Amino acid sequence: MGNAIREKTIHGIAASSGIAIAKAYRLETPDLAAEKRTVADVEAEIARLEAAVAKAKEELEAIKQHALEKLGEDKAAIFAAHLLVLDDPELLNPIKEKIQTERVNAEYALDETALFFISMFEAMDNEYMKERAADIRDVTKRVLAHLLGVTISNPSLISEEVVIIAEDLTPSDTAQLNRQYVKGFATDIGGRTSHSAIMARSLEIPAVVGTKTVTAEVKNGDIVIVDGLDGQVIINPSPELLAQYEQKRARYEAQKAEWAKLVHEATVTADGIHVELAANIGTPDDVKGALANGAEGIGLYRTEFLYMGRSELPTEDEQFVAYKTVLEQMNGKPVVVRTLDIGGDKELPYLQLPKEMNPFLGFRAIRLCLEMQDMFRTQLRALLRASVYGNLKIMFPMIATLDEFRQAKAILLEEKEALLRQGVAVADGIEVGMMVEIPAAAVMADQFAKEVDFFSIGTNDLIQYTMAADRMNERVAYLYQPYNPAILRLISHVIDAAHREGKWVGMCGEMAGDPIAIPILLALGLDEFSMSATSILPARAQLKKLAKEEAARIKETVLSLGTAEEVVSFVKRTFSLA
């Protein structure tokens, strides 16, 4: 009875699939309270600060190397960015000035300055900038610990099977997790796009984040179930519930084993129609995971990771090597590269772009590239040079008008002609397309379809722009509705317009891998589904059981419904989805 009384379920956000059952290990946040003291020797205090920064750099360098070996280049880039923070005079100079002018101790000056920057970034109210706040918090916590002589928990020392419970996991915490012992984790804060969630998916560790209260409810040694499928954390489950979850875990593992058999199969519907399943990637390191999960191509190569976590623009040759590597690894399979989508909410400090009131509607992506043409042309040259090494397709992000697309394509053709004049080989017939993520582009799809080779629908932005709802703002997140009939009608309009001109349509937003969305998108005629690598095999298994002709019959009904709830209910009933 004792267990039954103490059993408790907490709800959070399913951040990484799977089920973990193990003893709880609380990753405690050390007391880093920085009391204010007056110092007599200002120079000695600045020297203390610099010594602590140097030690923090040593640790981060070691963690970066560990991440590089275990997780790949893109995850290691997080720590390269942290090292840049510790070299940033905009952070360090105000700390030193505070020590000098106020004659205060280094701990207090660091803490106060960090809090100022953290609150400034958090007030910007978009996920990317909030993650910059998390970077500063992680880095300054490490320096502060050295100043205070406090030891920070090291998850790499765990030597028994556990589920980690923490307020949050910093990137450096997550990079040190050993999969042999850490079976899952649950945190109070965070979302699906936070560093810890991304790392968990990379490590394939079940995770639930954003529970708000898990650290208040769980003690060391409690038996905890982390349900990364449904976003639940069960504390001290009853023997009956524990047995149910053991079965649920076994079913999930068996299902994964069945999915694994589909790795080398093409995606063919029950009535014999081929549908392309592709992967979204950020770096060349991601190709390995894409192929291991049976990707038939790369539907979105986000090139901005090449530009982030560094102090200057990548050179043409650096970019060429990255693009060539991806194309060669994909061995003739299509690779759709999105040109630089940066600016506004995704900052590159070295570009020194002005702060904007509304970065999502501001100077970003193709708008920035058409103005900063030297940077844009460098990327296009690198892509064109790499094109001979595989099946390259190029697409431009955030296109709102025909003029933008025409201008971007004209620049691409100018660079191609210049390379050919120089005797540099460029592939023939490179397809050039665009992202459809702005409602204006979706509405005008019939005109764009005459000039593009393909469309890729970016649902993440298309939904928030159409619904006028920031998906990272909890107060309006209920309006972020992928199944809203307005969104489905736009998607249908884009696909129909493209098909009338003989062009193909892909989708690279999260919606493409959603089990409820898949039958709808098949019904609407989507040609290519591009998703995170781990979603490919479940999607393939689902599509093999669906008949395209049968799915097509629901198109009219789905588009005639009035609410997202009605759409979901209808699709679940029709296709027997849970």
Swiss-Prot record:
The keyword Kinase applies. GO terms for cellular component: cytoplasm. One of its GO terms (molecular function) is phosphoenolpyruvate-protein phosphotransferase activity. It is an enzyme of class 2 (transferase). The active site is at 195 (tele-phosphohistidine intermediate), 508 (proton donor). Keywords: Cytoplasm, Kinase, Magnesium, Metal-binding, Phosphotransferase system, Sugar transport, Transferase, Transport. Mg(2+) binds at residues 437, 461. General (non sugar-specific) component of the phosphoenolpyruvate-dependent sugar phosphotransferase system (sugar PTS). This major carbohydrate active-transport system catalyzes the phosphorylation of incoming sugar substrates concomitantly with their translocation across the cell membrane. Enzyme I transfers the phosphoryl group from phosphoenolpyruvate (PEP) to the phosphoryl carrier protein (HPr). The reaction takes place in three steps, mediated by a phosphocarrier histidine residue located on the surface of the central domain. The two first partial reactions are catalyzed at an active site located on the N-terminal domain, and the third partial reaction is catalyzed at an active site located on the C-terminal domain. For catalytic turnover, the central domain swivels from the concave surface of the N-terminal domain to that of the C-terminal domain. The N-terminal domain contains the HPr binding site, the central domain the pyrophosphate/phosphate carrier histidine, and the C-terminal domain the pyruvate binding site. This is Phosphoenolpyruvate-protein phosphotransferase.
